[in-house]
Amino acid sequence: MASNEEILAGLAEIVNEETGLATEAVELDKSFTEDLDIDSISMMTIVVNAEEKFGVRIPDEEVKNLKTVGDAVSFIANAQA
């Protein structure tokens, strides 16, 4: 089970690979759409890559609830527990 810091670092890498954003820009309080300017197609790619990286399943109906990076970190941490 990964720590929240490890999950954040992993998500930052995934976001960087998909969007080119610096990993340092990916912070817990950042909104995927408003702050990081991630569109729905990129978000789905990020979700699929996060599922593979962390060994969790993020149902499609949950993706809309992942507004911030912190929401995603919490969801992944709980899914791994």
UniProtKB/Swiss-Prot annotation:
SUPFAM superfamilies in the cross-refs:
ACP-like
Q: Name one GO cellular component term.
A: membrane
Pfam families on file:
PP-binding (PF00550)
Main location class:
cytoplasm
| Pathway, per record | Lipid metabolism; fatty acid biosynthesis
Query: What does the record list as GO biological process?
Result: lipid A biosynthetic process
Modifications made to the protein after synthesis? 4'-phosphopantetheine is transferred from CoA to a specific serine of apo-ACP by AcpS. This modification is essential for activity because fatty acids are bound in thioester linkage to the sulfhydryl of the prosthetic group.
Which superkingdom does the taxonomy of this entry point to? Bacteria
Disulfide bridge positions per record: none
Output the Gene3D superfamilies linked to this UniProt entry.
ACP-like
O-(pantetheine 4'-phosphoryl)serine PTM positions: 40
Which Gene Ontology molecular-function terms are recorded?
acyl binding; acyl carrier activity
Q: Which residues form the Carrier domain?
A: 2-80
Which family does this protein fall into?
Belongs to the acyl carrier protein (ACP) family.
Q: What does this protein do?
A: Carrier of the growing fatty acid chain in fatty acid biosynthesis.
Name of the protein: Acyl carrier protein
Source organism of the structure: Arthrobacter sp. (strain FB24)
Name of the gene this protein is made from: acpP
